[in-house]
Amino acid sequence: MHEIITLQLGQQSNYLATHFWNTQESYFTYAENEESAIDHDVHWRPGLGADGSETFMPRTVIYDLKGGFGSLKRINALYDIHDDDPAQSSSLWNGQAVVQKAEPIEPSAYQQSLDAGLEPPQLTTESVRYWSDFNRVFYHPRSIVQLNEYDLNSSIAPFERWDSGEELFANLDKEHDIVDRDLRPFAEEADHMQGIQIMTTVDDAWGGFASRYIERLRDEYGKTTIWVWGLQEGFQGVSRDKRLLRLVNKAKSLTEIYKQASLLVPIAIPSSLSPRLRKVLSLDTNSSWHTSALLSAAIESATLPSRLKDATNRDSLGNMTDLLNLHGKQTVANLQMSFSETTEVPRSEEVGDEPKDGLRLDLDLRPADDMGDGRKQQNGYHRTPKIFSQVLASRGERTGDDEEEGDSDEEDDRTRRRGPREAISRKYRTTLSYPLPDSFPHIFRDEKGEELKSNVAMTTSLSTDAALSGRLKSLRSTVTRLIGVEDRETLSNELAEMADEYHEGWSSGSDSGEDD
């Protein structure tokens, strides 16, 4: 087995991860002669419930603030043992106990139907209050970690500054040794751990928490592949001061995570869409349920090779990292996606004059890196960047040609690079389409504008390109004047050094690749 352990840090990341786990749950097959294309052992752990029954639960640790779990209980039905005689419970206190309880959050109608084994009602943006409202899986009690030091959405003490997250991690780690308490039990269960996948926001306090967590992980698991999905919120309707704070948080997160992670992929919903995308994508950008669904579909598809059974198109997170990181320091990648009906091939276009220069997909998920970027950006694109390396994952294309192409198809899927200055590329393929469980919002449309309700063909791209150099310089010019004198020079230098790794001339020092 090549297990992957997931860490989920914060409310927005848990929305994202809930879609991810619901998708993994949908891959299970129950017919006697039906075999799944997915190796479930990569993300799921076997165990025993309180009654001795076998269980299969995610290899994940979920962190959220007080009030962030909604109606989700730490002890679920598989581990709940009812004690009818409280006198039998062990206690060192013989006096009268006074128990204070907060008003419990009522489970959503969707959750109540799942618990009762009934057909659940269709979810809506109004009925989804928390990520747990559309959750379809059981978690091990060890997976649930509530941080009581901060309340969710508090206006008195908001969890929004990078330094607050850094401080919280330091205090908790000093008291509990977080890695040893929370992650090590899952790591010790793994026969051959493939890597650690982390989902976190990077433009708030969770960025500071994540940065120090990853630093500890690197100390404990020096050679383990660590992938970080760095979520960033949009700027629409956000005050100038909050925008600047988020950019400072992001700059600190990028420089700190860059030092330790094997791969960091910043992601966000584009601020505007092309007319075609507005036709085929029905997205409520004010709904975390909607936006996290789109991002999760891209992430789940991009990492699909890491859990496929098909040896030809299966690959590890470590190998994909090596393909993207050509020179040892290009560890920040960009995520793109295209989707369509399963009877069609998802749209893409060549970046340069030949396919060797890379492919550009419909939707670019790189975040805004300066105050004006979100206003001028459409589908995430400026000018066409020089691509250094690209890893493509294509799923659900039912053209009928795959089995007949034989050797030519196999040759096309191999890692290709024709010359020292050309993009290196690798493409993974599977007929397994992206599933749409009933917990997933109806955001995908066909070219006629009609809902896609069962599954979707999808292509994703992870790439390293020269555009990041200009973006990092733009971020640097915005945030350095906002940082205290004691940290300003260090942060400025670190952003500049990161930008230098993505010049179009690679190690030549050429500035020709700057796009901003």
Where do the language-model regions lie?
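Terminal, contiguous helix-loop blocks that mediate binding/assembly
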Residues: M1-T201, A205-D516
